[in-house]
């Protein structure tokens, strides 16, 4: 079954503990350090548009790209509510096309972990590089092998919420470094009845050195990386370690002339 179909309806409710505000503060702080205080910014793998909205409200001219029409419908509902002028495009990040270049590209909340092959991840990096202004920034996070193998691998989570209940089963493939998670959702409809929906998602963990290598092979310049769980604007950048579950990377376009 397609990813983020029924899940899109309840995604924000299930992800309510994700620290989007803190992540946005860190991203905005970094961009301002590089004198990117406004202008065109792409949210790649934007999902339901939470990060896109936060950056738009901070004064950036936002474009959001996502593969799921259902998730983009949720993003557009937020856009209608906020009044922010955001362009949403339904595209695969492995072959996305834009109308021009961006001052920065952001990609957060595990979006790149859906890329299961190294050559495809490199292709995403190459496309990002192509659509960055000279000296533009690429800010992204990615979950590690350690997180899938040692923290959530083979874990089952079940919860009841106001409008839905879910069972989230994880199955980790050591050979491929791929985590399969099967979602069984029970979503309350307008009649008060619960409809059962099932989805299967696959995410791959990546090691720090491999991601750094692919950044450089794509033509981007690696700037720095740090533990992605400490992402508030004023928090200390914690170095990457073997226990890091999420790594935040900063890369930069470094070959185009102004």
What is each of the regions a protein language model found here?
Residues 97-104:
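A short acidic, Gly/Pro-enriched loop at the edge of an enzyme's catalytic core
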Residues 122-134:
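A short glycine-rich, Lys/Arg-flanked "PGG" loop and its adjoining helix->strand segment in the class I
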Residues 113-115:
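A short His-aromatic
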Residues 202-258:
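C-terminal lobe and adjacent flexible extensions of AdoMet/dcAdoMet transferase-like proteins
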Residues 1-37:
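Conserved class I S-adenosyl-L-methionine
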Residues 108-110:
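Residues lining the SAM
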């Amino acid at each position: 079954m397609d990813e983020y179909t029924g899940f899109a309806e309840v995604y924000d409710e299930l992800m309510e503990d994700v620290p989007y505000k803190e992540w946005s503060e860190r991203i905005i702080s970094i961009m301002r350090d590089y004198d990117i205080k406004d202008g065109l910014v792409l949210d790649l793998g934007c999902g339901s548009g939470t990060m896109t909205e936060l950056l738009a409200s901070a004064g950036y001219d936002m474009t959001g790209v996502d593969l799921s029409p259902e998730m983009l419908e949720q993003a557009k509902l937020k856009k209608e509510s906020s009044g922010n002028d955001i362009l949403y495009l339904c595209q695969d990040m492995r072959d996305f096309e834009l109308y021009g270049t961006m001052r920065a590209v952001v990609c957060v909340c595990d979006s790149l972990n859906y890329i299961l092959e190294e050559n495809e991840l490199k292709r995403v990096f190459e496309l990002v590089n192509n659509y960055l202004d000279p000296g533009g920034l690429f800010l992204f996070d990615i979950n590690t092998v350690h997180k899938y193998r040692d923290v959530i691998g083979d874990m089952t989570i079940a919860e009841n919420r106001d409008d839905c209940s879910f069972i989230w089963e994880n199955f980790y493939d050591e050979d491929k470094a791929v985590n399969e998670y099967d979602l069984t959702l029970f979503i309350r409809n307008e009649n008060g009845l619960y409809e059962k929906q099932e989805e299967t998602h696959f995410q791959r963990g990546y090691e720090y050195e491999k991601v750094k290598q692919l950044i450089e092979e794509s033509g981007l310049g690696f700037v720095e990386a740090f533990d992605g769980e400490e992402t508030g604007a004023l928090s200390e950048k914690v170095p990457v370690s073997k226990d890091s579950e999420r790594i935040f990377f900063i890369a930069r376009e470094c070959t185009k002339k102004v």
